[in-house]
């Protein structure tokens, strides 16, 4: 059982966001990012985290992805030509780019400063500025994608492995 004084300290150290769901918290270097249903909040500090930046969005977030330097959000797009909109932010919360796209992905993630999207038959790789570096069909299910060397990546699939050179 907590004492009244301990309970007061506990209440003052936390953050309360009414009507907001925070399904995921990730540590990016020395900061923590709370991925919220309406955006994200960046915190700094280990003992008593300090709120550094909050980014709120109006659209419903359907996917998130991140690495130590980037935080990405994906929304449904109302356009008939492009199904989705991607927004990528720096780890300081500054918008780097926004991009509409039409790849029916099942997985989206960051890998060595690239954004990797894939489904059972397609793979798309974007750089951290949103420029497309690779798009193609694949035979098999993508299991992993990681860097081998300068612009060379290993695509691991259920049917085998392929080396891809990005342009």
Each model region followed by its residue ranges:
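Short loop/turn segments that connect beta-strands within beta-propeller blades
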Residues: 8, 45-48, 90-92, 127-130, ...
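A short beta-strand motif characteristic of beta-propeller blades
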Residues: 11-17, 49-55, 93-99, 131-136
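Repeated scaffold domains used in trafficking and secretory/extracellular systems
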Residues: 18-30, 57-68, 101-112, 140-150
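Structural motif
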Residues: 4, 38-44, 80-87, 123-125, ...
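Single conserved hydrophobic/aromatic residue that forms the stacking wall/gate
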Residues: 1-6, 10
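Blade-level signature of beta-propeller repeat domains, shared across WD40, Kelch, NHL, RCC1
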Residues: 142-167
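Residue-level marker for isolated small/hydroxyl-bearing positions within beta-strands
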Residues: 35, 74-76, 118, 155-158
